[in-house]
Amino acid sequence: MNVLIISDSHGLEEELQTIAKRHEAEVDLMIHCGDSELETRHPALEPYAVVKGNCDFAGDFKDELLLTAGSRKILVTHGHLHGIKQTLLNVYYRAEELGADVICFGHSHIAGSEVLRGKLMINPGSIRLPRVRRTESYAILTLENDAATVRFYDQAGNEIEDLQNRVTL
């Protein structure tokens, strides 16, 4: 199962549509981790399961979603309500409460993935305003049995190889 994860697009429309179209045949689920700054029913968000970010004032997005991808549960949140810029433990504990195996979040605009106490944490970065790295990014998570692979891509669809992460869940 493949899951496209994007976040912090901050008003971009065409780019969201281009990325969705590029990967629509290869992914089973598309997630937007907030700060789209678009209306809830905006056409650019149509293929995505979207949560509310701290810059999403229009629309009625939920603060979090619990999605199923194969046998795995994915917690989707923006991260600002969990203080992810200070610690990942708060969002980890929320995932524990919900029984989630994977946590997708944004807010910091810093692309990366890691396993914390058995839970895969993924921040796809930002396709508008990346931090730390200068490359706009999004991610694709591949789930296979007990293995997960996270690949990151720039806005043009080129893989950012040094961010790839393969883990056991």
UniProtKB/Swiss-Prot annotation:
Cofactor(s) required, per the database record: Mn(2+)
Pfam family, one: Metallophos_2
Keywords: Hydrolase, Manganese, Metal-binding
Molecular function GO labels: hydrolase activity; metal ion binding
Binding of Mn(2+) 2, residues: 35, 54, 78, 107
EC number: 3.1.4.-
Cofactor note: Binds 2 manganese ions per subunit.
UniProt enzyme class: hydrolase
Name the UniProt record assigns to this protein: Probable metallophosphoesterase YsnB
Species, as recorded: Bacillus subtilis (strain 168)
Lineage per the UniProt record: Bacteria, Bacillati, Bacillota, Bacilli, Bacillales
